[in-house]
């Protein structure tokens, strides 16, 4: 048996271990909820936990379908394990953290380096356009209440550029491997042309990245079709390692494929796609759109009618998958097994 075959068998054992992890922290005490240690893999048949993590790090260097997870930053006093980057499944390739500009608790910040070195997981700072618009709207409401004139379109565009820069700078401030550029539409009700706002945002990213992005990773997620209308879209897409398309409320692969066909016509590259699905929330267990395991099955399957690459899966609200009785991150772990083995492990 050659070395590569042995490595392959051992990796398959790791995926079995991933699928078998259960919620060890429990809900019995506050200390269990807040301790920051990683929920590491139970050792496979012949590996210690350290050896298992070494195999996962090695696997992440090989061609495979990637898993990207999104989580929220907590600026002070995390109270639950799901708020910790270290609690995310060991086999996640990337974690992007939202709202780092609002600050990150020191304990959580220290875990960024730990997951990078221990698990080989890349950590990205999220740069969110909607958050910028929301901040602008709040500022305008305060001005109106104070009887002051609201900002002009020119001031709004300058605000976008400045706030984009501040979010981008979180990459280096927290030792991240790169950035996730999130454009999920225009939410502002106090400004005019949303196209100008979108253009200011992407141009600010593009200019900053050309000066500060050497050796780092950039991805884009959201409404890629809208980004395609920006004047630097071709160059910007060229910089991105992955382009993350939102499945949204769609439940059929055909509907998603139709969206990609339209994107391609409008200039979005077809060879960088990762697809984003969501898990139900603790407050509403209704599945919206394609489930994470179903999305993984579609992504791992080949099709002669799909003229685009399916490179992996993104889960925007990964933290919500923590809340399972008896098993944390159940849908994500199932999806990881499906993506990397083509089959679903026994549940």
Each PLM stretch: what is its role?
Residues 100, 104-197:
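Substrate-binding cleft of extracellular glycoside hydrolase catalytic domains
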Residues 71-89, 153-172, 226-235, 288-304:
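Short, acidic/polar
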Residues 63-130, 134, 331-338:
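N-terminal carbohydrate-binding/catalytic regions of secreted carbohydrate-active enzymes
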Residues 91-100, 228-256:
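Aromatic- and acid-rich polysaccharide-binding/catalytic face
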Residues 1-13, 17-62, 67:
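Bacterial Sec-dependent N-terminal signal peptides
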Residues 66-70, 124, 202-230, 240, ...:
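Aromatic-lined carbohydrate-recognition surfaces of secreted/lumenal glycan-active proteins
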Residues 251, 271-347:
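Substrate-binding cleft of secreted/luminal carbohydrate-active enzymes
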Residues 83-89, 107-123, 169-174, 231-238, ...:
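Acidic (Asp/Glu)-rich catalytic clusters
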């Amino acid at each position: 048996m050659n070395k590569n075959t042995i490595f392959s068998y051992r990796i398959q054992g790791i995926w079995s271990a991933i699928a078998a992890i259960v919620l060890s922290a429990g809900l019995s005490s506050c200390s269990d909820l807040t301790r920051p240690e990683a929920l590491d893999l139970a050792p496979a048949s012949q590996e210690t936990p350290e050896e298992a993590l070494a195999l996962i790090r090695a696997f992440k260097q090989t061609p495979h379908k990637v898993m990207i997870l999104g989580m929220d930053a907590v600026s002070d006093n995390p109270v639950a394990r799901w708020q910790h980057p270290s609690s995310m499944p060991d086999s996640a390739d990337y974690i992007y953290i939202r709202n780092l500009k609002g600050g990150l608790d020191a304990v959580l910040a220290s875990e960024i380096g730990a997951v990078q070195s221990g698990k080989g997981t890349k950590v990205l700072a999220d740069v969110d356009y909607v958050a910028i618009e929301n901040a602008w709207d709040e500022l305008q409401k305060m001005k109106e209440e104070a009887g002051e004139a609201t900002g002009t379109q020119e001031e709004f565009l300058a605000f976008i550029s400045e706030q984009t820069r501040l979010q981008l700078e979180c990459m280096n401030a927290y030792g991240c491997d790169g950035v996730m550029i999130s454009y999920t539409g225009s939410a502002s009700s106090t400004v005019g042309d949303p196209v100008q706002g979108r253009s200011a945002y992407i141009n600010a990213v593009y200019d900053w990245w050309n000066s500060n992005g050497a050796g780092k990773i950039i991805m884009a997620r959201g409404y890629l079709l809208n980004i395609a209308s920006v004047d630097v879209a071709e160059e910007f897409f060229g910089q991105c390692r992955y382009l993350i398309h939102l499945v949204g409320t769609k439940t059929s692969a055909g509907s998603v494929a139709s969206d990609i066909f339209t994107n391609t016509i409008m200039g979005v590259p077809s060879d960088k796609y990762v697809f984003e699905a969501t898990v139900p929330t603790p407050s509403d267990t209704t599945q919206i759109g394609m489930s994470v395991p179903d999305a993984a099955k579609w992504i791992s399957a080949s099709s002669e009618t799909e003229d685009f690459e399916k490179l992996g899966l993104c889960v925007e609200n990964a933290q919500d998958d923590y809340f399972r009785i008896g098993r944390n991150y159940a849908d994500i772990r199932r999806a990881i097994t499906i993506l990397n083995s083509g089959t679903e492990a026994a549940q």
